[in-house]
Curated annotation (Swiss-Prot):
The keyword Transferase applies. It comes from Emericella nidulans (strain FGSC A4 / ATCC 38163 / CBS 112.46 / NRRL 194 / M139) (Aspergillus nidulans). This is Diphthine methyl ester synthase. Pfam families: TP_methylase. InterPro entries: 4pyrrol_Mease (IPR000878), 4pyrrol_Methylase_sf (IPR035996), 4pyrrole_Mease_sub1 (IPR014777), 4pyrrole_Mease_sub2 (IPR014776), Dphthn_synthase (IPR004551). It comes from the Eukaryota. It catalyses: 2-[(3S)-amino-3-carboxypropyl]-L-histidyl-[translation elongation factor 2] + 4 S-adenosyl-L-methionine = diphthine methyl ester-[translation elongation factor 2] + 4 S-adenosyl-L-homocysteine + 3 H(+). One of its GO terms (cellular component) is cytoplasm.
Amino acid sequence: MLYLVGLGLADERDITVRGLEVVKKAERVYLEAYTAILLVDKAKLEAFYGRPVIEADRELVETGSDDILANADKVDVAFLVVGDPFGATTHTDLVLRARELGIESKVIPNASIMSGIGCTGLQLYNFGQTVSMVFFTETWKPSSYYDRVKENVQIGLHTLVLLDIKVKEQSLENMARGRLIYEPPRFMTVAQCAAQMLETEEERQEGVWGPDSLAVGAARVGAEDQKLVAGTLQELTQVDMGRPLHSLVLLGRRAHDLEKDYIRRFAVDEATFDAAWQNGKYGSS
């Protein structure tokens, strides 16, 4: 049996009781280590689980899935995923490959950023499509996310923006030369995301958002040192949210007064927040 086990958002204690039971009985335990990171290292997981954990990078999961699934028709294999197991399409692919091989699979769900973002006080049913923000380069600044956010904005819904992480990535030069040299890990910050959003708007010029649009930055959701900051996009380009992982929510104009009251506590500057709320006509249907 292949088990996909959600680990939750913060540390080794966030696994569910059912998930821990699976981990303890499995023949092999893999930790998916590239679509998201847990806020503790692998050694802490191993100490808590009382058994070794095999780190599964992008290459192993996407091209070596048969190695992960080896003998899973006879023994239990646990595949651990930060957040919820189906937070990335790669994990769906793994289940489909297991089906092709006649291997049964079972999912043990857990909290993910999609539900955890409720810690901002923004009501989950007021969210529209979720988008991803990748690191821009000098020659590559994709803006396809802009159109999805535009649809959310047009109907007044919040947008959760998931921020890029680069783990065990190669430079183009090293890839071209066939050298297995990896770049240092990089994790996008709320400040970088806000700056890139303003850069995209400057390029597109469709008025979907602007420097005075309100947003909420969230860091290390679910952890003891979770941090929330609310403000305009311009203000958020200057905030330091600390260590990863970060997310950003662009507020929709249908935001409720209860949501305003909740997030105002985290404002960079309450007077600026109040002015942006009023001038942006937030709270209107």
